[in-house]
UniProtKB/Swiss-Prot annotation:
Presence of the UniProt keyword Transferase in the record: yes
Name of the protein described by the UniProt record: Ribosomal protein uS12 methylthiotransferase RimO
Originating species: Campylobacter fetus subsp. fetus (strain 82-40)
Stored PANTHER family: RIBOSOMAL PROTEIN S12 METHYLTHIOTRANSFERASE RIMO, RIBOSOMAL PROTEIN US12 METHYLTHIOTRANSFERASE RIMO
Enzyme class: transferase
Keyword set includes Acetylation: no
Keywords: 4Fe-4S, Cytoplasm, Iron, Iron-sulfur, Metal-binding, S-adenosyl-L-methionine, Transferase
Binding annotation for [4Fe-4S] cluster 1: 11, 45, 77
Cofactor note (record): Binds 2 [4Fe-4S] clusters. One cluster is coordinated with 3 cysteines and an exchangeable S-adenosyl-L-methionine.
Amino acid sequence: MPNLYLVSLGCNKNLVDSEIMLGRLSSYNIVDKPNNADVMIVNTCGFIESAKEESVRTILELASYKKENSVLVVTGCLMQRYRDELMKELPEVDIFTGVGDYASIDEMILKKQNLFSPGVYLQKSDTKRVITGSSYHAYIKIAEGCNQKCSFCAIPTFKGKLKSRDINSIIKEVKELTKDGYSDFSFIAQDTSSFLRDAGINDGLIKLIDEVEKIEAVKSARILYLYPTTASMGLIDKIIASPKFVNYFDMPIQHINDDMLKIMRRGSSKERLKELLTKMRVAPKSFLRTGIIIGHPGETGERFDELCDFLTEFKFDRISAFAYSKEEGTLAYEMEQIPSKTITKRLNTIEKIIKKQIEGSFKSLVGEVIKVQINGSSSEGEMFFGAKSIIWDREIDGEILINDTQIKDPKVGEIYDCKINEFVKDKLIGEIICNS
């Protein structure tokens, strides 16, 4: 059996594509090091400059491990976006492919053939996946592409317009995964709240929630990547009322100043954002995550200060901050740019605010009893089990450490009542009270 080594870079949407490729390559032995791999695959990210640089570094690193008759495959967003340039500049690569042919990866390797189908690959209900990183949680991609026209984002130029999966296809996938023991699901897309708008249906997520709630084996679920102009009050109400979907609200705002929101072509206003966020915040046991961009063209010192003030006053649980990246094919590319030193200085300022906000969110749980799921061994070694709040996403929201002597027969994915005792060095420490 030949050995396969795969590196998945970028977002969890890329991870799903990688898992689809692993499903097509089930006849290979998956290895965790490239040294003895017969086939190496890099699923690249092409979103911002730092991601592009990481992708190229990874490709060149894996090329150094090539042996006689081994195959190096490069796929994903970077490849789709810079097809001609990369094929010319990377002679080390044996097979090039973009974002439309993940389900044909086995044939490409067999024939040692490049393949670039028009459009993106849209997952089908019978698509096989090898879920990685968890035995109880899975990401479910509900759409591809994006109809938004944000000034800074190049994704629509290589992913195309919104293409939603059929609800029946999604529900069939979830049902099949529950048969394999999966009970916790995160629904993802570039803009989840636009789901089914390409079919003329507004609030398609409400229809999806209705169907997921009928699946008894689903214990918990959440929706990531809401977009401010397509996330309705009705959708928020539906999530709050749902017995399956937790009150997890992930909505990147990118900025709060009205002038900046117009320049960035976000389609929303400060007033509308505050209205949505407040409704999310006051929901019982709600968890709010957002993302912001620092240094976009047009961001004056005064506009940046307004963002800082808002992030200081409004209580988010998690905030991801990104330095603006000048990307070809975007409106912002042609705008007057802000000096990199200014962007770095502003990013350092905002990160101090974020650190304080996140610490406050963690500390608010000390003394509380919350429901957690066991992930397995912790990042701190064998003395602790790692767990997460049932509300949190699997990978990005943190870890709760639990002494391994407190659970006689721990089951990964099992839900427990946990009392949070301490917050130490970005980690919560808790004790299991009972099986929930």
